[in-house]
């Protein structure tokens, strides 16, 4: 069973709202960089970057972050053909003394964000990391909290939340898949 909880128009309105929140929170955008966690987080980061530029005239430096080697669940993969493939980060971005806007699609246990923060240290010591999450579904295992949330969606552990993006899925929407 599938239920669409955010359609295309609401998806883009959510991008716009989060972009406004980022601009409003910071007196200046000069020391901000935006980093999207591959794959869907990176596409959401790209949408945010474009919208912030439309609203402020400032093009934030950005990067796609691959966290493959920083994950703590690789030992749980029992088949070699199921192992994730490292595709690298899109470019090197010096985050030293910058405020990093870290972007991902779904916040669940918090483990992906922990891995992303570990990966970010390879690019310098950020002054601050702020977290943008498109959908927060709860069920945290680590003390991770988002600074900007598109939508809070209470779920059961059996449900799956899918954030769908144009490049990955051919559309912008969010669905809950249940049993």
Curated annotation (Swiss-Prot):
Keyword Transcription regulation: yes
Recorded catalytic activity of this chain's protein: UMP + diphosphate = 5-phospho-alpha-D-ribose 1-diphosphate + uracil
Superkingdom in the source lineage: Bacteria
Principal EC category: transferase
GO biological process: regulation of DNA-templated transcription
EC number: 2.4.2.9
GO molecular function annotation: uracil phosphoribosyltransferase activity
Keywords: Glycosyltransferase, Transcription, Transcription regulation, Transferase
UniProt protein name: Bifunctional protein PyrR
Organism: Haemophilus influenzae (strain PittEE)
């Amino acid at each position: 069973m599938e239920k669409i909880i955010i359609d295309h128009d609401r998806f883009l309105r959510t991008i716009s709202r989060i972009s406004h929140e980022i601009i409003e929170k910071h007196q200046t955008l000069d020391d901000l960089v935006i980093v999207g966690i591959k794959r869907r987080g990176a596409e959401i980061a790209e949408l945010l970057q474009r919208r912030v530029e439309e609203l402020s005239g400032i093009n934030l430096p950005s990067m796609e972050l691959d966290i493959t080697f920083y994950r703590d669940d690789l030992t749980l993969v029992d088949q070699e053909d199921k192992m994730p493939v490292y595709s690298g980060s899109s470019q090197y971005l010096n985050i030293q003394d910058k405020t990093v806007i870290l972007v991902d699609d779904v916040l669940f246990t918090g483990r992906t964000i922990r891995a992303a923060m570990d990966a970010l240290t390879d690019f310098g010591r950020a002054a601050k990391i702020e977290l943008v999450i498109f959908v927060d579904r709860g069920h945290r295992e680590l003390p991770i909290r988002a600074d900007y949330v598109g939508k809070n969606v209470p779920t059961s552990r059996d449900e799956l939340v899918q954030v769908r993006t144009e490049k990955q899925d051919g559309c912008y929407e969010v669905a809950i898949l249940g049993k």
